[in-house]
């Protein structure tokens, strides 16, 4: 997690927040816990809530976004680039940010770290905007993409709760209440 390059990005900007969330996703993949990361990594305090929201949202939709990337990108990009795509695709799916602003800020985040990939990221995100309904329907054909849980967990729940496994998986992914 030492390799966070956000030095040219304004902390109040969405590009900084996408970049930080992507770095956290990569670190989780390397075995770090989010609790540990949020405690140890310096994040601009004003940006912290949005970085956390982006990170948690991306993790909740990891199966779907990874499925889309693996389906629509012939050569899988490097981990951090994939993580930026996951953050951006999740937000486009949830429709919580202005779509074109989100695409622009994701491309700025990529340009700050991996400028060679900005055209690819821009193309993937814009393609999603054009083909959103088709991508969402395609995700429903894959259990990991549909339920956003690993296949081993889906199989375990199917075996232990053959009549209730789908509701169990579905109730596990929404955001928690703000209480």
Where are these regions (language model features)?
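Class I Rossmann-like S-adenosyl-L-methionine
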Residues: 1-179
């Amino acid at each position: 997690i030492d390799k966070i390059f956000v030095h040219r990005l304004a902390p109040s900007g969405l590009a900084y927040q996408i970049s930080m969330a992507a770095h956290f996703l990569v670190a989780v993949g390397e075995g770090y816990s989010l609790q540990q990361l949020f405690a140890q990594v310096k994040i601009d305090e004003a940006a912290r809530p949005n970085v956390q929201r982006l990170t948690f949202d991306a993790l909740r939709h990891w199966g779907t976004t990874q499925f889309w990337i693996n389906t629509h990108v012939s050569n899988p990009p490097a981990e951090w680039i994939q993580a930026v795509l996951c953050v951006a695709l999740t937000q486009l799916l949830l429709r919580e940010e202005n779509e074109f602003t989100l695409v622009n800020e994701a491309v700025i985040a990529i340009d700050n770290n991996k400028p060679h990939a900005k055209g690819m990221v821009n193309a993937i995100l814009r393609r999603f905007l054009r083909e959103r309904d088709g991508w969402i329907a395609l995700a429903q054909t894959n259990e990991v993409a549909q339920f956003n849980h690993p296949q081993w967990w889906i199989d375990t729940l199917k075996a232990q709760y053959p009549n209730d496994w789908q509701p169990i998986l579905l109730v596990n992914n929404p955001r928690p209440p703000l209480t």
